[in-house]
Amino acid sequence: MMSVVLIGDSIRLGYQPQVQRLLAGEAEVWGPETNGGHAVNVLMHLHLWAKHRQPDLIHINCGLHDLRTDHFGGGEPLVPLPVYALYVERILRYLRTHTRAAVVWATTTPVIDAAAKAEHARWSDFDRSDADVRAYNGFATAICARLGVPVNDLEAVVRARGPETMQNGDGVHYTEAGSAILAEAVAAAIRAHRPR
């Protein structure tokens, strides 16, 4: 049976159980119990999450934690775009050289600006912007194209349906039904790119 590793943030944690159900009998699907966080954290954990597991396929994303602008950080993204691009390339090259897995990159899902801003205003912690989602995805997909890494465009899946119809009201996270739609797209990408 094919072994699959899912790496990503809380969006991945939301769709992972449904991907496991969709691929039951086809693939053993595993993902870290923890949120993958930003690209630097993902790279720091790839030896545990990917190298030592040696799966057949890795479906991976990071971005929402990279592009967040912390209120205590002067309004700059936690991981600025040029640094994010550097780390995305390092992540993909690491997976290529340290695993035998097929790799699928997933784009970062959209942010509803007003809802996200209202949610985080309660905590005075950080903001996210949909314009940054588009910019960060643009850099990541260009790197994937250059390296020959297929992309599962979850951003496009959500935009086609309408983020407001899938999200739970906080501008970022998904309802169970929304996560089910993402899970279907992830399962389809895994089936399409499974090693032959």
Where are these regions (language model features)?
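Catalytic nucleophile-elbow at a beta strand-turn-alpha helix junction centered on a G-D-S/GDSL motif
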Residues: 1-17, 38, 67
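Short catalytic-loop micro-motif centered on adjacent basic/acidic residues
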Residues: 5-8, 31-32, 173
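Short, flexible loop segments at the rims of nucleotide/cofactor-binding pockets, characterized by
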Residues: 7-9, 34-38, 81, 128-129
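A short, Lys/Arg-enriched amphipathic alpha-helix followed by its capping loop at the start of a domain
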Residues: 15-27
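Alpha-helical cap/lid subdomain in secreted, periplasmic
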Residues: 22-25, 43-196
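A short beta-strand-loop structural module common to alpha/beta enzyme folds
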Residues: 26-42
